[in-house]
Amino acid sequence: MAWQVSLLELEDWLQCPICLEVFKESLMLQCGHSYCKGCLVSLSYHLDTKVRCPMCWQVVDGSSSLPNVSLAWVIEALRLPGDPEPKVCVHHRNPLSLFCEKDQELICGLCGLLGSHQHHPVTPVSTVCSRMKEELAALFSELKQEQKKVDELIAKLVKNRTRIVNESDVFSWVIRREFQELRHPVDEEKARCLEGIGGHTRGLVASLDMQLEQAQGTRERLAQAECVLEQFGNEDHHEFIWKFHSMASR
């Protein structure tokens, strides 16, 4: 018989219904549903009494829960070498698989089911990470647009500076030629005019140089911000969400 199962379907089958992470020390209740041992303990505090299954609500004997060996074998067979251990909740020691939209923090399944985040809107970490990556891409696009504007401003300032310097050279040449035709009595007037045009030019050039320096500084800061955003995109889901949320709150 041929079997065809998608990766998403397989991932759903291997997830604990409580913590929404891959089973760890899976136990099967008498009703047939399986959960992480840690999740069942957190739910009922111990397994020596009756346990109400969170899926079918059937009350079963917790002490009769047996390890789901077949499921553990499947998970172990599919686990990649060197897979990092997931970050866990400090309260329940379960994987941080959810993101509380109200409190803007990472939580585990039990935090959302029974803890302080009960009834809060929550989203799977992978979905939040995808959403934040989209926001990061939009921010990156805005950054590129700002860089383009700064580059255009710098090009315009450089062009204006060159034009003013060239025009100043032409005016100076015209003035020199005109004054060469005059006699000595007008030499002082010639010098005064040249100094005037020179001072005016220096003032304009100094102003443009200052604007150029400011624009180039802005471009460098935008480039640094671009580098930081690119580095955020390479972080793992949890580090990325923590750092992105920290940056956005500022």
Swiss-Prot record:
Stretches annotated zinc finger (RING-type): 16-57
Keyword vocabulary terms for this entry: Coiled coil, Metal-binding, Zinc, Zinc-finger
Coiled coil residues, start to end: 125-169, 204-235
InterPro entries: TRIM/RBCC (IPR050143), Znf-RING_euk (IPR027370), Znf_B-box (IPR000315), Znf_RING (IPR001841), Znf_RING/FYVE/PHD (IPR013083), Znf_RING_CS (IPR017907)
Entry's Gene Ontology cellular component terms: cytoplasm; cytosol
SUPFAM superfamilies for this protein: B-box zinc-binding domain, RING/U-box
Pfam families, per database record: zf-B_box, zf-RING_UBOX
Any one GO BP annotation for this protein: innate immune response
Zinc fingers classed as B box-type: ranges: 84-125
Keyword Transmembrane helix: no
Positions of Zn(2+) binding: 89, 92, 111, 117
Annotated GO MF terms: ubiquitin protein ligase activity; zinc ion binding
Family (UniProt): Belongs to the TRIM/RBCC family.
Full protein name: Tripartite motif-containing protein 74
